[in-house]
Curated annotation (Swiss-Prot):
Protein name: Glutamyl-tRNA reductase
Listed GO biological process terms: protoporphyrinogen IX biosynthetic process from glutamate
Binding site for NADP(+): 189-194
Catalytic residues as annotated in Swiss-Prot or TrEMBL: 50 (nucleophile)
Catalytic class of the enzyme: oxidoreductase
EC number: 1.2.1.70
Lineage: Bacteria, Pseudomonadati, Thermodesulfobacteriota, Desulfuromonadia, Geobacterales
Task performed by this protein: Catalyzes the NADPH-dependent reduction of glutamyl-tRNA(Glu) to glutamate 1-semialdehyde (GSA).
Remarks, miscellaneous: During catalysis, the active site Cys acts as a nucleophile attacking the alpha-carbonyl group of tRNA-bound glutamate with the formation of a thioester intermediate between enzyme and glutamate, and the concomitant release of tRNA(Glu). The thioester intermediate is finally reduced by direct hydride transfer from NADPH, to form the product GSA.
Family from the record: Belongs to the glutamyl-tRNA reductase family.
Record's comment describing the protein's domains: Possesses an unusual extended V-shaped dimeric structure with each monomer consisting of three distinct domains arranged along a curved 'spinal' alpha-helix. The N-terminal catalytic domain specifically recognizes the glutamate moiety of the substrate. The second domain is the NADPH-binding domain, and the third C-terminal domain is responsible for dimerization.
Length: 434
């Protein structure tokens, strides 16, 4: 049995293509059941996120199985396969294992190290387990992927540094203030960058948010989203002393904050430090504000430098993660390679035993002058011959199952001796790790 992967991602397809074949998370039962009804698709899991759509399956026929999965993607969503084909990738065997381990560990994500993808794969597996479309192979496979991702996050620092401008602002604020739990954030502007920064600051423990904008209604909407306070733009300097962290991103064509404005603000704060982040282009804050005592000003270039440094660090950590994944691939492939060894050996022995017994019974029934212990001796003789004949192939099969590829040997024995083998019964769903 082989693991195969067919899918597309942000690396191979535009959002226009990705959205055409996205699966609704609340409607997974139908496509999952349709997948395992396809000839030779034994198990199936569907991963569908904003950045990727992937089908994981187990099948005996690798080429046929992957072709059927591609056809299913097109047919289910009403998109010609010819349209999808240039954007699709497919993997099997070790390559499929490597791909899924890398995806789960966030090495294939748009932002390397982001944690969301692991939760999304767990959710996808949860649907497959609920509708019983995963079995012994994909159960073991995905739980191994979860443990590999956990090991990567534990043994590397791949997710420990900011790789977005908004989160870099939080990282710098923590370097200045340490604990943010008693710090108030003032947002000057109500655009997407301010909103994202507010989320990061609050997720990292900031006490509260104030929002000001030239259009007061927009400030109100954003403040309401974060249970904060909206400030009229003309009241900015009357309220600024209440903020420990100020993030500015407006469309102004001139400085809206100058050193003389901050001199009075810092006095009202009794010289308590203030942290200004100017992510506007053109800049909102006069660079000379940084000369005011106890004021720390960072602009977009400063933040980009932090991001660039952290991206380099993540790249180094990603190399460590790749090493962990290669190690884990070897261990898992040994298991999946040996999965069909025992049933094949059992079937081979059973085949030989059936022949031995049939021929022995014919001989015994035709032998009229058989000595009293003749039947017993012939039984032992024929059993010994069968054991001698079967010892080399079964020993070789066991040996390859412990440390190498077995598909060649298993397939050869099945073909040569017309063996019918079955995998163990699916073990059902496994409890998801936290």
């Amino acid at each position: 049995m082989n693991i195969v992967v067919v899918g597309l991602s942000h690396k191979t397809a535009s959002v226009e293509i990705r959205e055409k074949i996205a699966f609704a998370p609340t409607q997974m039962e139908k496509p999952l059941r349709m997948l395992i009804a396809i000839d030779d698709i034994a198990e199936a899991v569907i991963v569908s996120t904003c950045n990727r759509v992937e089908l994981y399956a187990s099948t005996r026929d690798v080429a046929g199985g992957m072709a059927r999965l591609k056809r299913f993607l097109g047919d289910y969503h009403g998109v010609p396969v010819e349209v999808l084909e240039p954007h699709l990738y497919s993997h099997h065997g070790e390559a499929a294992i490597r791909h899924v381990f890398r995806v789960a560990a966030s090495l294939d994500s748009m932002v390397v190290g982001e944690p969301q993808i692991l939760g999304q794969i767990k959710t996808a597996y949860g649907y497959a387990a609920e509708f019983r479309t995963s079995g012994i192979i994909l159960n073991r496979f995905l739980h191994k992927a979860f443990s590999v991702a956990k090991r990567v996050r534990t043994e590397t620092k791949i997710a420990s540094s900011a790789v977005s401008v908004s989160f870099a602002a939080v990282e710098l604020a923590r370097k200045i203030f340490g604990d943010l739990s008693d710090k108030t954030v003032m947002l000057i502007g109500a655009g997407e960058m301010c909103e994202l920064a507010a989320k990061h600051f609050l997720n990292n423990g900031a006490r509260g948010v104030m929002v000001t904008n030239r259009t007061y209604e927009r400030a109100e909407r954003l403040a309401e989203e974060f249970e904060g306070k909206a400030i009229h733009f003309e009241d900015l300097f009357d309220q600024l002393h209440k903020a420990d962290i100020v993030l500015s991103s407006t469309g102004a064509t001139h400085y809206i904050i100058r050193p003389k404005d901050i001199d009075e603000v810092i006095r009202r704060r009794k010289m308590k430090p203030m942290f200004f982040i100017d992510i506007a282009v053109p800049r909102d804050i006069d660079p000379k504000v940084n000369d005011v005592e106890n004021v720390y000003l960072y602009d977009m270039d400063d933040l980009q430098n932090v991001v660039a440094s952290n991206l380099q660090q993540r790249a180094e950590e990603a190399k460590k993660a790749e090493g962990i994944i290669e190690e884990e691939i070897g261990q898992f492939y040994k298991w999946i390679s040996s999965l069909e060894v025992t049933p094949t050996i059992v079937a081979l022995r059973s085949k030989f035993e059936d022949v031995r017994r049939a021929e022995l019974e014919k001989t015994l029934s035709a032998w009229k002058d058989l000595p009293p212990d003749g039947a017993k001796r012939l039984e032992a003789l024929t059993a010994a011959i069968v054991n001698k004949l079967l010892h080399p192939p079964t020993a070789t099969l066991k040996r390859t199952g412990q440390g190498g590829r077995t598909d060649l040997y298993v397939d050869a024995l099945r073909t040569l001796f017309d063996l019918q083998t079955e995998l163990p019964e699916p073990e059902g769903s496994l409890e998801l790790e936290e």
